[in-house]
Amino acid sequence: MELVFIRHGQSEWNAKNLFTGWRDVKLSEQGLAEAAAAGKKLKENGYEFDIAFTSVLTRAIKTCNIVLEESDQLFVPQIKTWRLNERHYGQLQGLDKKQTAEKYGDEQVRIWRRSYDTLPPLLDKDDEFSAHKDRRYAHLPADVVPDGENLKVTLERVLPFWEDQIAPAILSGKRVLVAAHGNSLRALAKHIEGISDEDIMGLEIPTGQPLVYKLDDNLKVLEKFYL
C-alpha cells in the first residue's frame, strides 16, 4: 500500500518569510509552478489516486487541484477538512520571521516554530483575523476553534481525521493523496513513522515535492522517499 503526501507549493507569505498559519493566502508564481511540476512528476511515475484529502485553506486546495489536473486526475473526489489545516500560529500570524527573531531572540522563535509542546502567544478571539470570525469554521463549537497551536495540539486535531477517514481509505485499498501543510503533515509523519517528540523538531517537509510512503497491512512504514 502507498500513501502520497504533498505540502502545498510556496505561498505568497512563504516567499515573504511571514508566519502564515490559518491565514488564507494564495500560492506564489513559484508555488503554482511547484504544484504543476509535482503533478507531472506523479503522472510520469504512474501514480494514480482514488481519493484526495486536503485542508480548507486556499493554498492547499489549489495545490491539490493543480496536482490532480496535471496528472489527468481532476475527477478524483476531494474531501476538504479543517483538521488538515496548517498549525495555528496565534499572534505570530502575519509577522515577519526575521523581525520577530530580532524582537524576541532567535532561540525563542525557534522554540515557537519547532518545539513539540510550546504554544505561541494566543490570538484574541475578537481579533479581526480570528478564525472565530471566518465562516469556514462557523459549524464548529467555539471551544474547538484554536487561537494558537503547538505541534502536539496540531497532532491531536489531525489524528481523529487520520483514524476516521485516511487510514480506513488506505486499508480499503484506495490510493490516497494528502495535500496539506508543513505542520499538519509533520504531525501525520510523527504518528505514522513513530518519530519522537525531540526528533520531530528537526523534520522539514519541502513545498511542492511528493512524499511517498510504502506501508504494510498495519500501516507501518516500509519505505519513504521523495519523487
Swiss-Prot record:
Its EC number is 5.4.2.11. It catalyses: (2R)-2-phosphoglycerate = (2R)-3-phosphoglycerate. The active site is at residues 8, 86. GO terms for biological process: gluconeogenesis; glycolytic process. CDD domains: HP_PGM_like (cd07067). It holds the Pfam family His_Phos_1. GO terms for molecular function: phosphoglycerate mutase activity. Gene3D superfamilies: Phosphoglycerate mutase-like. The record marks 181 as: Transition state stabilizer. It is an enzyme of class 5 (isomerase). It comes from the Bacteria. SUPFAM superfamilies: Phosphoglycerate mutase-like. Pathway: Carbohydrate degradation; glycolysis; pyruvate from D-glyceraldehyde 3-phosphate: step 3/5. Keywords: Gluconeogenesis, Glycolysis, Isomerase. Substrate binds at residues 7-14, 20-21, 59, 86-89, 97, 113-114, 182-183. Catalyzes the interconversion of 2-phosphoglycerate and 3-phosphoglycerate. Homodimer. Belongs to the phosphoglycerate mutase family. BPG-dependent PGAM subfamily. This is 2,3-bisphosphoglycerate-dependent phosphoglycerate mutase. It comes from Neisseria meningitidis serogroup C (strain 053442). The gene is gpmA.
